[in-house]
Amino acid sequence: MTTLTLNTSLLSSRRILAAFSGGLDSTVLLHQLVLWRERHPDVTLRAIHIHHGLSPHAESWVRHCETVCARWQVPLVVERVTLADNGLGIEAHAREARYRAFAQTLLPGEVLATAQHLDDQCETFLLALKRGSGPAGLSAMGERSPFAGTLLLRPLLRETRKTLEQWAVRHGLCWIEDESNQDDAYDRNFLRLRALPLLQQRWPHFPAAVARSATLCAEQERLLDELLASDLTDCITTEGTLRLSPLMSMSDVRRAAILRRWLAMRNAPMPSRDALERIWQEVALARDDASPCLRFGDHEIRRYQSQLWWIKSVAGQHETTVAWPVWQTPLALPAGLGTVQLVPGGELRRPREEESVSIRFKAPGLLHIVGRHGGRKLKKIWQEQGIPPWRRDTTPLLFYGETLIAAAGVFVTREGAAEDKEGVSLVWHA
């Protein structure tokens, strides 16, 4: 193995963030990137280590990564993530948390490099095959993928695990061994420890053949993307929702392809065939007066105004009141709803000295809003403003004392309207 085995054609960016677990694969990747940096002094290289908290050795792994990065003069970011049960299983949840941390750490103009190799590609293909995936799932991993507004690069994807190990031994590299990698209760470990050695004993080039099949599946998906581009344009709204009316006249196969691509655009997990059928039958075709909802992990698919919505699940806050004693500073909202702040300049009056300020999520009685005659109940206002049902008890309502002043981004009440130029605006950062 030589330095040329790193697919440097991918490294057009000169700012690289390398995912570094401290294991064999990521150690070889980081070593090769360090050598690449030596030949290209304009390259800026950082590493990121994710502390999942799953192993009793996690702290020693952090120290190992710090030592390696210090020796190679690579700035290291250590991110500690908290894993909670979200119904996806520990492997999937750890991966989700890991990539969320990657996305949050990337700097402008920086690309992410990860250490997946040919054997990983084979495992990913077989896991997709086990799930009954179609060409999209069987495409496995690409060497270059869009990620968090930049790129995710896999410059070792053409190399085998054996080749990486030979490189590491030849160059005297040290790496950690995660004890969980020997637990064949995990599907990927079962393939790596039991199934693939047997297959390679019979067919030594099995991983390379699988990689070729994955490439062919990816090419078919790209062709379908081109052919369905105009359909997607017709179906997807500026808000990212999916119009149902164009789908009604499509064949089952074409409609399923559109649904899959829409979900991919929303960064949703690849749905199974059964899941697509449930989306169509239970959500899209639910009766007109229903508010159908189908859960997928910590997200939901809902229907509103003849459109499908992919949204994050948030518990209703109907009974919640959040005091805002220092209204001049931003206020954190519960349930991950973000923050609100009152900024100078706007159509809301400032609170009077004797008025307490709070955020609530319900308002009783008849409300009089700016631009409308007569009083209306809040439910009627939500309907008139086209606010989906699931946003109605999660949209912040600003109160001064017991007086409703405004709904963030939706309306201002007459009692809350500014009478002079010294008004404020309610800004919601969801």
Swiss-Prot record:
Provide the protein name. Answer: tRNA(Ile)-lysidine synthase
Q: Which reaction does it catalyse?
A: cytidine(34) in tRNA(Ile2) + L-lysine + ATP = lysidine(34) in tRNA(Ile2) + AMP + diphosphate + H(+)
Q: Which gene codes for it?
A: tilS
Where along the chain is ATP bound? S21, G22, G23, L24, D25, S26
Localization in the cell: Cytoplasm
Identify its protein family.
Belongs to the tRNA(Ile)-lysidine synthase family.
Major localisation: cytoplasm
Q: Which GO terms describe its molecular function?
A: ATP binding; tRNA(Ile)-lysidine synthase activity
Name the EC number(s). Answer: 6.3.4.19
- Keyword list, A-Z: ATP-binding, Cytoplasm, Ligase, Nucleotide-binding, tRNA processing
Protein's UniProt keywords contain Cytoplasm: yes
A single Pfam family, by name?
Answer: ATP_bind_3
What organism is listed for this UniProt entry? Salmonella dublin (strain CT_02021853)
What stretches pass through the bilayer?
Answer: none
